[in-house]
């Protein structure tokens, strides 16, 4: 059951880093075209 805990921590760390970079830098890729 330790593998599940490591996977959860791994996903949480990557998620936090991804959102930190996404909110820190301006969105270069704009999905909504106005």
UniProtKB/Swiss-Prot annotation:
Keyword Transmembrane helix: yes
Main location: membrane
Gene Ontology, cellular component aspect: photosystem II reaction center; plasma membrane-derived thylakoid membrane
Pfam families: PsbT
Entries under InterPro entries matching the protein: PSII_PsbT, PSII_PsbT_sf
Gene Ontology biological process terms, A to Z: photosynthesis
Domain of life: Bacteria
Protein localization: Cellular thylakoid membrane
SUPFAM superfamilies xrefs: Photosystem II reaction center protein T, PsbT (SSF161029)
Keywords associated with the record: Membrane, Photosynthesis, Photosystem II, Thylakoid, Transmembrane, Transmembrane helix
Topology in membrane: Single-pass membrane protein
Classification via NCBIfam families: PRK11875.1
Family: Belongs to the PsbT family.
Function: Found at the monomer-monomer interface of the photosystem II (PS II) dimer, plays a role in assembly and dimerization of PSII. PSII is a light-driven water plastoquinone oxidoreductase, using light energy to abstract electrons from H(2)O, generating a proton gradient subsequently used for ATP formation.
Known partners and oligomeric status: PSII is composed of 1 copy each of membrane proteins PsbA, PsbB, PsbC, PsbD, PsbE, PsbF, PsbH, PsbI, PsbJ, PsbK, PsbL, PsbM, PsbT, PsbX, PsbY, PsbZ, Psb30/Ycf12, peripheral proteins PsbO, CyanoQ (PsbQ), PsbU, PsbV and a large number of cofactors. It forms dimeric complexes.
Protein name (record): Photosystem II reaction center protein T
Organism expressing this protein natively: Mastigocladus laminosus
Gene: psbT
